[in-house]
Every structure is written in structure tokens, then in C-alpha cells.
A protein has these predicted regions:
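Rossmann-fold NAD(P)H-dependent dehydrogenase/reductase core
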Residues: 1-125
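NAD(P)H-dependent oxidoreductase Rossmann-fold/reductase module
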Residues: 66-223
């Protein structure tokens, strides 16, 4: 609680733009022996792409990006099983592999892009069984967006989909795998697409592609 209050008082805009307030569990591993968040957000999709590449001609792979931090990524624990921020680490991996994966898929007529939906209010509070509280929280988010002008506070799903729709439907000459397409809104809720360069390290990208390809081979081996 102290961390939340401190974040709100010291850096309110950056606080709301991150997942700083979320508590994430360490040591979560799937039945396949992988970090749970890593397999959910990265490898499951990567494996699907690897197996369907030849059937995807003319299509696009749109990764959903989010808060990504190099500070949370460690090569020795690239699946971030034992770190504090597995979610941020998984999104950092997405940013790193987007360009080399796009280069690999292009000969098949497939593009690989990253879009970010911003902060969308989903049913994450539904488990509390307090619908009025949910409405209150959403109302507070609208108020904060209007007062502070936080462009990534898309709040509703339609506005949050703006970046993904652009990445999926824009003409070929209008998209670039080195760009992340952000869903953004004005204070009053008018949606638009912000374009920002991906922060990428080529050595890290090559390392991650090698690890992911190795995991794909492991899954393709006869049991």
C-alpha cells in the first residue's frame, strides 16, 4: 500500500502508465516446465506461428505489447520465473523479437507487428462481486484521464483496439516492424494511433530467437 501511495504522489502519470501497482507472483511454472507468463504471452504464440507459417500467406501477426522494461529482463532467467515483473519481461521479449521475426516471415508474405492497447478496463474486478465498485473505478479512470491527459488511458475496448486495427488493416507501405502502434486517446476520448520506435537490442533479439527456436524444436520432437 505504501508503494502505491508513494507512486501516486511522486510520479502519478508514470504510475498509471505502468503495472507498478500489480503484485506478481514468483516461481510459477507450467506443466511444460516453462515460466507461466512467458509461455502465455510469448512462447505459445511463437509455437503457433512456427507451425502455421506456410498457411499464413498474406496475413499479419499482431503482437499485443504493453509496459516493457529492460530492467526486468535477465538472460539467465529469460522466462522470468524468479523475477518480480514477469509480465513486463514478457512484453520486453515481444519488442525484441518483432523485427527479426518479421524478417523471417516476409518471404512467406507474412508481416509481424506490435501494437499496444493502452490501459483498458476489462472485467478484472468482476470476481469481487461488486458491480457498483467496478463502475466507480472506471469513472475514476475517466476523471484521471481528463485531468492529467494520459493518452494511454483508452479505457474502453473500442479505443484500445485502435492500434491493433491499424496494424492489421493499414496498407503494406504504411506499416513497419520497427514501430510500435499505440492506441491513444485525447482527454475527451477521441481515439487515434501513436507511432513510436521499438526499443530493441540486436544481440538480445538474436539470443531470444535462438532460445525460442530451441523450445520449438523440443516441442516438435516425438514424445
Amino acid at each position: 500500500m505504501f508503494g502505491i501511495v508513494s507512486g501516486l504522489l511522486s510520479h502519478p502519470i508514470a504510475f498509471f502508465e505502468s503495472s507498478e501497482a500489480l503484485r506478481q507472483k514468483r516461481g510459477l511454472v507450467t506443466a511444460d516446465g516453462m515460466g507461466e507468463t512467458f509461455q502465455t504471452n510469448v512462447f505459445g504464440h511463437y509455437l503457433l506461428i512456427a507451425r502455421l507459417t506456410e498457411a499464413m500467406a498474406g496475413g499479419r501477426v499482431i503482437w499485443t505489447g504493453s509496459a516493457a522494461s529492460q530492467l526486468q529482463f535477465k538472460a539467465c532467467d529469460y522466462q522470468h520465473v524468479w523475477g518480480d515483473k514477469p509480465y513486463e519481461s514478457s512484453k520486453y521479449i515481444v519488442d525484441q523479437i518483432a523485427v527479426p521475426l518479421d524478417q523471417r516471415l516476409r518471404p512467406f508474405g507474412v508481416r509481424c507487428l506490435v501494437a499496444e492497447p493502452g490501459n483498458v478496463c476489462t472485467n478484472f474486478l468482476a470476481g469481487l462481486g461488486l458491480p457498483l465498485f467496478e463502475y466507480l473505478v472506471v469513472g475514476v479512470f475517466y476523471f484521471i484521464r481528463f485531468v492529467l491527459g494520459i493518452a494511454r488511458f483508452t479505457i474502453n475496448a473500442d479505443s484500445g483496439a485502435e492500434g491493433c486495427c491499424y496494424a492489421a488493416l493499414a496498407d503494406e507501405e504504411c506499416v513497419d516492424s520497427r514501430i510500435k502502434y499505440h492506441s491513444q486517446v485525447t482527454r475527451t476520448g477521441k481515439a487515434y494511433v501513436g507511432q513510436f520506435p521499438l526499443v530493441q537490442n540486436k544481440d538480445t533479439a538474436a539470443f531470444l530467437m535462438g532460445r525460442l527456436d530451441g523450445l520449438v524444436k523440443r516441442f516438435d520432437e516425438p514424445k
